[in-house]
């Protein structure tokens, strides 16, 4: 099952899910159309991969920011950059990769603030890996 959430600022507006990632996005598009909801100030979060097709679909909806917990394709990233979209991948907890359009991202004002690692989690290339 794939899910999508349409957000305005930090507030979720609607959640849709489907067995297909594209279908979940289509349900969001349909809801926006039926409710007369504008897209310019919205963010779309999806559980699906950030492929070129997902970027094109989101761009056609007029949504400037596309976020996923999943991975991405090089073509999807290139298209997002060409279209002036913000693309964020691998979002889990407070960690994420800004792949395109980082000028829209408001970074934490406290440089000392760091996300807590999940218990037992070790990242590749971490200091602990080098010491082993």
List where the protein language model places each region.
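Conserved catalytic-core subdomain
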Residues: 55, 60-132
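Conserved mixed alpha/beta catalytic, RNA-binding, or beta-rich assembly cores of soluble enzyme
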Residues: 1-49, 53-56
């Amino acid at each position: 099952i794939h899910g999508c959430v349409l957000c305005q600022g930090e507030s979720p507006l609607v959640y849709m899910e489907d067995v297909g990632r594209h279908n979940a996005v289509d349900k969001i598009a349909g809801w926006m159309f039926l409710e007369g909801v504008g897209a310019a100030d919205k963010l779309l979060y999806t559980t699906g991969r950030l492929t070129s097709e997902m970027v094109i679909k989101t761009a056609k909806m007029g949504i400037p920011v596309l976020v996923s917990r999943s991975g991405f394709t090089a073509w999807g990233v290139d298209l997002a950059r060409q279209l002036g979209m913000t693309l964020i991948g691998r979002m889990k907890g407070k960690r994420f990769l800004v792949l395109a359009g980082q000028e829209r991202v408001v970074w934490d004002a406290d440089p000392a603030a760091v996300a807590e690692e999940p218990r037992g989690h070790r990242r590749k290339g971490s200091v602990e890996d080098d010491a082993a």
